[in-house]
Each structure stands twice: as C-alpha cells, then as structure tokens.
A protein has these predicted regions:
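Intrinsically disordered, low-complexity regions enriched in serine/threonine
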Residues: 27, 38-241
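Short, well-structured alpha-helical interface segments that form or flank functional binding sites
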Residues: 3-7, 27-29, 50
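Beta-rich nucleic-acid/ligand-interaction surfaces
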Residues: 19-40
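Amphipathic alpha-helical segments
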Residues: 1-19
C-alpha cells in the first residue's frame, strides 16, 4: 500500500510535495507527510500557518488507511490542530480498493486548499482577545489535558491511592507557563501556542528523547497529543465568541 500511496501523491504532484516518510515498529505503520503547495496564510506579519496532508497506513490494523489534514505554525513548527470537520475526513478500510478511493482526492485537496483561510481567521480572532495573568491559560490547560487527570495514582508520600491533581502534571504546566511568558503574547492565541508547543516539542517522560520524539509524532497525528491540541483550539475559539 505504501507504493500505491506514493503513486497517488505522484498523480497529484501539482498540489502536493512529499516532506517526509516515517515508518514505525519495524514497518508496521507509515506516515507520509506532504506539504499542500501554495497553501500558506499569515495570522499576522511573519506568523505563517501552513497546511499539511498526512497519509496514514498500517499493516497491523492499528490504523485505517486515511488522510489527515493538519495546520502548522511555521515560526516554531507547532502543530496547531487537525481539521476534523466531516468534509475533511477521508478514511477507508484496508479491504477496500485504494485506487478507487483515491479518485476523491483531487476534490478533497481543493476543499482544504480553499479552507485554510477559515483557520487563519480563527487564529486572528484569538489574537484579539487579551489575557491578564495565567488564570485563563490554566483553565485551557486543564481542559485540554483532562485525560491526564483521570483515574487514581499511589501517592509517593502516603503510599495510598488518591485522585490525581494538577500537581501530578506540574512538569507540563511549568512548560506551558514558560512557553507563554517566553513568547510574550498574552492573548488566547498566545495561550494556544503555549500549549501546542508543549505538546509538539516537550510532551513525554521517557529519558530516551529519540523514543519520545517518535511517540510524540504518532500521538500528534493519531493520538492523545493531537486530541489535546484540538481540544485547546476549540476551547480558545469558544472564548472568542
């Protein structure tokens, strides 16, 4: 199926440029990341957002064969959210014919090329909402990483089971706050970037950073990191209304 994916991309080379191909778990799955040509918009001068199309394939049924559209901030390569509206979904079961499925791709690419401006306008709306202190940042952070606070853990001091608290994700919260103050953009857009930077570049507690990076990459495209960024984006957008 990888060769077919590359054939499909070649057929659409006027619109797509392959950026990288990543194989994981000894070839059990692959992600083929493509830039969508001439598909860049600016939130403000020098702050560009680019849209990517990622083909996901697996040979162990971990993933359906599908295409994911993701917005990226070029300034820092933050993942800024997956485009999950119904018109942006293109998924197939492995039992179906990929060649037949791919006939829908040109129309799908056209939809998403035209749709980028909607994302840009959303980010601009976030940038107009100024924040004071870190109360709103903290609320968005807790809302976005709520999955990390589910369940119980054994307290290191008392050795008894207890519910998780924000103290158990203090590393993540410290990273988000540091990102927020470093960027010096005290707006909803700045809050979103603080969280997306942490999830894109810092998330993970494995000492081996190479493993961390691979785990993050998978998680950003089709896992918890991507989910948290999507939740943060939706929450920030809701606060602009």
């Amino acid at each position: 199926n990888n060769s077919r994916t590359l054939d499909i991309i070649e057929q659409n080379k006027d619109f797509l440029d392959i950026e990288n191909v990543i194989n994981g778990q000894g070839g059990a799955f692959s992600f083929v990341s493509c830039a969508m040509k001439d598909n860049i918009g600016e939130v403000s001068q020098g702050d560009a957002i680019k849209r990517r199309m990622i083909f996901i394939n697996s040979f162990n049924n971990a993933y359906s064969y599908k295409v994911v559209i993701i917005d990226f901030r070029l300034f820092c390569f933050n993942q800024m959210g997956r485009i999950n509206k119904s018109k942006n979904k293109l998924t197939m079961k492995h039992s179906k014919n990929i060649t037949s499925w791919s006939k829908h791709l040109p129309e799908y690419i056209a939809q998403n090329r035209d749709d980028l401006q909607e994302s840009i306008e959303q980010f601009r709306a976030m940038k107009k909402v100024e924040l004071k202190g870190t109360e709103t940042l903290r609320e968005i952070f807790l809302h976005s990483l709520a999955d990390k606070l589910k369940g119980q853990i054994t307290d290191k001091r008392t050795k008894e089971k207890r519910n998780k608290t924000i103290n158990d994700i203090d590393k993540e919260w410290s990273e988000v706050k540091n990102n927020y103050y470093r960027d010096n953009d005290f707006s909803l857009y700045g809050a979103l970037n603080a969280i997306t930077y942490q999830q894109t570049h810092s998330e993970g507690r494995i000492l081996d950073e190479n493993k961390n990076a691979m785990n993050r990459y998978q998680s950003l495209i089709a896992g918890p990191c991507g989910n948290r960024i999507d939740i943060a984006r939706e929450r920030c957008l809701a606060l602009t209304r």
